[in-house]
């Protein structure tokens, strides 16, 4: 089996958060498709944040795509230069006010925490595979940074991998980060378009929400079960 050959590409939408292209492709059998449309959005991360009493930190907010209030795990765009873990820490505090254990909002020692706790800068190849880099770089921004407290907290942040958003025509990926024993220590920092309510659910309550259709975000369900498989 061979990949398609890209013959031409025309940008139809070139916005900061969305790109749409019309591509001309040649299939292995020689057939040419003149108008295959692809989408690109920045990679984003979902955060499976579990409190000390084993409850999931979650959000409720209006989503215009579904025109409904949606129950979700915290999530957000990975900014340029950020690792998925770094983006997860930032988004978790911004949306919910929660921090990983031992983190102090506003601390200037974030780089020390991140290096000593082995949350490192990684890259990804074209197939989405993680390329590990042992060098710690890019300190977490001061507004969401925190300092290292104990050696026992070093395993609280776990990168679980990434998925294609839609293998058919979407070029972006979403990443999954699990953070255990989170604490509500900081203030939230919403964008001017956000109105977010924080809720917590036990694992049993959350699974019931999946079963009854209250929680129906397919990508986040995939991320949750990615974590669930690591518990066996």
Q: Where are the regions a protein language model picked out?
A:
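Nudix hydrolase/Nudix homology domain
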Residues: 1-4, 69, 80, 159, ...
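Conserved Nudix-box catalytic region and its N-terminal flanking loop in Nudix hydrolases
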Residues: 2-3, 39-41, 46-90, 94
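Acidic, metal-coordinating catalytic segment for phosphate/diphosphate chemistry
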Residues: 8-46, 52
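Residue-level detector of high-confidence beta-strand sites
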Residues: 9, 35, 59-61, 160-162
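Active-site segment of metal-dependent pyrophosphate-handling enzymes
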Residues: 19, 39-42, 50-53, 63, ...
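Conserved hydrophobic/aromatic beta-strand scaffold that supports enzyme active sites
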Residues: 20-24, 48, 58, 176-178, ...
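The catalytic Nudix box helix
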Residues: 58, 73-103, 143-159, 177, ...
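A cross-taxon signal for low-complexity, glycine/charged-rich
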Residues: 101-114, 119-153
């Amino acid at each position: 089996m061979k990949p398609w050959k890209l013959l031409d590409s025309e940008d139809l939408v070139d916005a900061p958060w969305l790109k749409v292209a019309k591509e001309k492709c040649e299939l292995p059998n020689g057939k040419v498709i003149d108008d295959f449309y692809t989408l690109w959005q920045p990679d984003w991360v979902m955060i499976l944040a579990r409190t000390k009493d084993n409850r999931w930190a979650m959000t409720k907010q209006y989503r215009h795509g579904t025109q409904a209030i949606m129950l979700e795990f915290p999530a957000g765009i990975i900014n340029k230069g950020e690792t998925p873990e770094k983006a997860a820490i930032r988004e978790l505090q911004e949306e919910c006010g929660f921090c990983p254990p031992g983190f102090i909002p506003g601390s200037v020692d974030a780089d020390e925490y991140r290096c000593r706790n082995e949350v490192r800068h990684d890259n990804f190849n074209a197939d989405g595979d993680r390329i590990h880099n042992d060098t710690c770089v890019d300190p977490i921004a001061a507004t969401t940074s925190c300092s290292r407290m104990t050696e026992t907290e070093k395993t609280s942040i776990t990168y679980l991998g990434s998925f294609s958003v839609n293998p058919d025509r979407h070029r972006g990926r979403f990443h999954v980060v699990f953070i255990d024993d989170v604490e509500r220590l900081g203030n939230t920092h919403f964008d001017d378009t956000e109105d977010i309510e924080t809720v917590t659910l036990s694992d049993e309550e959350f699974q019931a929400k999946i079963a009854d259709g209250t929680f129906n975000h397919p990508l986040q369900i995939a991320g949750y079960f990615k974590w669930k498989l690591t518990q066996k």
